[in-house]
């Protein structure tokens, strides 16, 4: 679990591809995601930065709701923690929607994105325009379905 905090969102990574592959390693298996920097560049940049910093290592999935989603990325495990900064939503020009198996930013309202994210079990169209979708599962749907509250992200590799 990370106790790192920053004052502002990270600078943009110059060599970030339009599609970035990320792997979340858990005791239940790996969740492999394609992250779409072409649609949500700030969000993907933030996720990559935090993953490379080890911010997510040892952090739990603190909220799990069956047939809805699994949520993690809060180093306190309470649902109120983050990296020390917030950044804006990315809806304009982003065609990604809350289908089954997407990764999206958890937030407390407009412009409050930080480190918390969720992965959907099923379509959640009521979240479109409220949370930035920035990727999709390419492997490990069964792992997402098996995750229980309190399960740990051992690490995220990008």
Annotate each PLM feature.
Residues 1-158:
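Cyclophilin-like peptidyl-prolyl cis-trans isomerases
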């Amino acid at each position: 679990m990370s106790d790192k905090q920053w004052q502002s969102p990270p600078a943009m990574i110059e060599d970030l591809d339009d599609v970035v592959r990320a792997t979340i390693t858990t005791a239940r298996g790996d969740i492999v995601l394609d992250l779409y920097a072409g649609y949500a560049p700030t969000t993907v940049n933030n996720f990559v930065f935090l993953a490379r910093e080890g911010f997510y290592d040892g952090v739990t999935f603190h909220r799990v709701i069956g047939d809805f989603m699994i949520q993690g990325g809060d180093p306190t495990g309470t649902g109120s923690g983050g990296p020390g900064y917030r950044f804006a939503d990315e809806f304009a020009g982003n065609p990604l929607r809350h289908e089954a198996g997407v990764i999206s930013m958890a937030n407390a309202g407009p412009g409050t994105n930080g480190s918390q994210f969720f992965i959907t079990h099923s379509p959640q169209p009521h979240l479109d325009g409220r949370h930035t979708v920035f990727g999709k599962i390419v492997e490990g749907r069964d792992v997402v379905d098996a995750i229980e509250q309190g399960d740990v992200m051992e690490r995220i590799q990008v």
